[in-house]
A protein has these predicted regions:
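C-terminal structured interaction module
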Residues: 95-97, 115
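Short helix-coil boundary/hinge micro-motifs
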Residues: 1-93, 122-125
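Cysteine-rich micro-motifs
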Residues: 97-108
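Short metal-binding segments enriched for Cys and/or His
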Residues: 110-122
Length: 125
């Protein structure tokens, strides 16, 4: 839907300013003023949306706020696509060093094997 299309534009943004502008557009379109709530006795927490919104609107709000919190808290570069050309998966880099390149260990291993084979080293038997 429209939310995921907008989110993919954030992922594919070429610089921090563009990424921030796109996230700000998502926030403006999907969120309300933040407020504290303790509905149904679930404990105090923040809501970034109006009560009674349909599920799609709630999810759009969560995606935009979550993305903004991740990028401002972890770093603007920590949202990316997998480095494996055949994989278009998106991942949020939560690594300690901020240098995650792959969406999964499987893709990291596949790319390591591809690079090893490209060097022309005969397989160990």
């Amino acid at each position: 839907g429209a939310t995921l299309d907008a989110w993919e534009k954030v992922v594919d943004a070429t610089d921090e300013s563009e990424r921030a502008a796109l996230v700000n557009e998502m926030l403006a379109a999907t969120t309300a003023h933040p407020r504290m709530t303790n509905h149904v006795g679930s404990g105090w927490h923040l809501h970034y949306r109006d009560d009674g919104r349909p599920l799609g609107a709630v999810l759009s709000s969560l995606i935009s706020v979550g993305t903004a919190l991740h990028l401002t808290g972890r770093g603007m570069h920590r949202l990316s696509r997998c480095a494996v050309a055949e994989c278009a998966a998106v991942f949020a880099d939560t690594s300690r060093t901020g240098r995650q390149r792959y969406c999964s260990q499987r893709c990291a291993n596949r790319d390591a094997v591809r690079r090893h084979r490209a060097r022309g080293v005969p397989p160990v038997r």
